[in-house]
């Protein structure tokens, strides 16, 4: 999308391969062993995502195996936690983050049922210098920002942060178990990726469902804290319907849930946050 380069003043991304969104340690080792020469952007940090964009979850052990060689090279580590709650609900130990060598953690609140907010946790205090200025430069200073941040307190104190994510994960597992289409990736968090033909996808769109083909060609479904079992069952009933003339309205008559807009199982609308080895712009390498 160009966002990293725009906000990073020329920062580039070096994509790293891996199965189902998890970086292959061998691919990372190969990237780290690349020579530092003038015609290559030098690496600066490793960016990881947990849960990943394909709905899989890194264990603390798997993250440690990726982070250790990066720290040995003197690079930084960024952990994108847009779906960190979903990873925690799937068994990832949140307390392990502070011992893994992560320098900067972004904790997503939106997907756990909060307003559109993220909490930035800076473990390397050197990176915190004038962070307020960076926020202002990025336009991240909304009026009354404390009201956006306040839900984090309640959600963390009463366990809602992980509880909501556990529900989303359970709905994804339900969808994966019932879908008539082959599931492309392991369902470990709240995402389900299926192999679907264009005709079926077209019928979904015509019926009002919001789903699209992801980077690998699979069709992406995301379940949220608000997704109901009835919505999942209704969607599955429609997917299994032989009559393509059936619509979402037709199935509402058959499903035990009220007609309130689009199905809660609809795509969450956020863009992908790719896992990559970040690279500093050559012109500002010494900054």
Located regions from the model:
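N-terminal non-cleavable signal-anchor helices
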Residues: 233, 254, 281-283
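Long, low-complexity, intrinsically disordered segments
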Residues: 265-287
